[in-house]
């Protein structure tokens, strides 16, 4: 009789825990990808078959809301990022270009042909960002990856000056760019399985990315409170490179192109750059790592449920794709 009573109490208690209300403040994971084009994701491909493999991005589109008419506030990086964080048009933040005030370079075919209009050297530290608003409402706020809301990556204010409790963006931290830290020769120095290799290949053959690694740590560490994570990947911005030689070889074969022997440039038009293909797939893999953590981790604020069940995930690009420059074709929008 005593055993039965104890069992009843346990069942009632467990039922009460499992039926606990969803927390009022959901978690937020905001993924802002660098220079990803709208046709660089399979789910948005409209004409010829997209060669890139993006199963995790496509999974988000199937399980969420897919927008077809979204427009960036600016065609370049810094103004668009400042606008997204502040909710204001670049003209209002007075940050309208990547670098302002540079004089023309005479007799230089790649130099500026005019002086860009004046703009602020960085976001106004008094600007009330979405991060500060969430922090004021009890959120733990984190940033990993790229910042660039000014004329360069080192200008004031930095993420911690705009409402972030945590940021990996340290100007002198060589690992701050993660897997996108420049390779001196993109046909050499590929990642290995050596434990001492900072880009060591994991069990699935993908290189370690410091940015994503720090994101995963933040998600795990902050799960006990409502969190806002601004995941600002350096992918798929130039330099075009793949630390996985296997991925580079895979896309050369898939595209029917010869494995490159010259590390400089790529002239084939369209979506036929194997370096870029490898970068897009690598990015997708990192997104999958974060989704897996959310899907498999118990939400301490909502017992019996996973983090993914009470997390808003927003996935977008800062300013759309870059088709290339005078030396190299990246992709085709």
Language-model region placement:
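Hydrophobic h-region of N-terminal signal peptides that target proteins for export
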Residues: 10-19
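Formylglycine-dependent
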Residues: 94-140, 147-242, 260-277
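Active-site-proximal N-terminal segment of extracellular/periplasmic enzymes that hydrolyze or transfer
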Residues: 22-65
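Short, solvent-exposed loop/turn and secondary-structure capping segments
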Residues: 39-46, 72, 79-82, 94-98, ...
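Histidine-centered active-site microenvironments of extracellular/periplasmic hydrolases
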Residues: 52, 155-163, 239-242, 293-333
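Short, structured active-site-proximal loop/turn typified by the sulfatase FGly-forming signature C/S-X-P-X-R
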Residues: 48-81, 87-92, 140-142, 162-171
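A long, amphipathic alpha-helix that forms part
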Residues: 212-219, 255-311
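Loop/turn elements at helix/coil->beta-strand transitions in domains of secreted/extracellular proteins
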Residues: 24-29, 63-68, 135-142, 162-165, ...
């Amino acid at each position: 009789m005593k055993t039965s009573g104890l069992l009843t109490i346990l069942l009632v208690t467990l039922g009460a825990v499992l039926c606990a209300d969803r927390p009022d403040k959901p978690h937020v994971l905001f993924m802002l990808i660098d220079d990803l084009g709208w046709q660089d994701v399979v789910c948005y491909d409209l004409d010829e078959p997209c060669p890139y493999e993006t199963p995790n991005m496509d999974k988000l589109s199937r399980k969420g809301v897919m927008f077809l008419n979204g427009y960036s506030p600016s065609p370049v990086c810094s103004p668009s990022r400042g606008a997204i964080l502040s909710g204001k048009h670049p003209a209002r933040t007075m940050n309208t270009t990547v670098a302002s005030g540079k004089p023309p370079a005479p007799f230089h075919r790649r130099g500026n042909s005019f002086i860009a209009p004046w703009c602020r050297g960085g976001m106004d530290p008094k600007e009330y960002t979405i991060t500060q608003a969430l922090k004021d409402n009890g959120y733990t706020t984190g940033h990993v990856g790229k910042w660039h809301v000014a004329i360069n990556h080192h200008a004031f204010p930095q993420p911690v000056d705009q409402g972030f409790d945590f940021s990996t963006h340290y100007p002198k931290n060589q690992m701050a760019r993660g897997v996108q830290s420049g390779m001196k020769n993109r046909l050499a120095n590929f990642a290995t399985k050596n434990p001492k290799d900072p880009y060591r290949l994991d069990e699935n053959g993908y290189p370690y990315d410091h940015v994503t690694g720090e994101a995963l740590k933040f998600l795990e560490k902050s799960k006990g409170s409502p969190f806002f994570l601004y995941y600002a990947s350096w992918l798929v911005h130039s330099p075009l490179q793949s630390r996985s030689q296997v991925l580079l070889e895979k896309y050369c074969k898939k595209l029917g192109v010869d494995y490159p022997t010259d590390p400089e440039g790529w002239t084939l038009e369209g979506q036929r750059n194997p370096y870029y293909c490898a970068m897009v797939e690598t990015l997708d893999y990192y997104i999958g790592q974060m989704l897996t953590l959310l899907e498999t981790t118990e939400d301490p604020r909502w017992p019996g449920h996973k983090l993914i069940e009470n997390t808003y995930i927003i996935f977008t690009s800062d300013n759309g794709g870059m088709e290339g420059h005078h030396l190299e074709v990246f992709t085709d929008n």
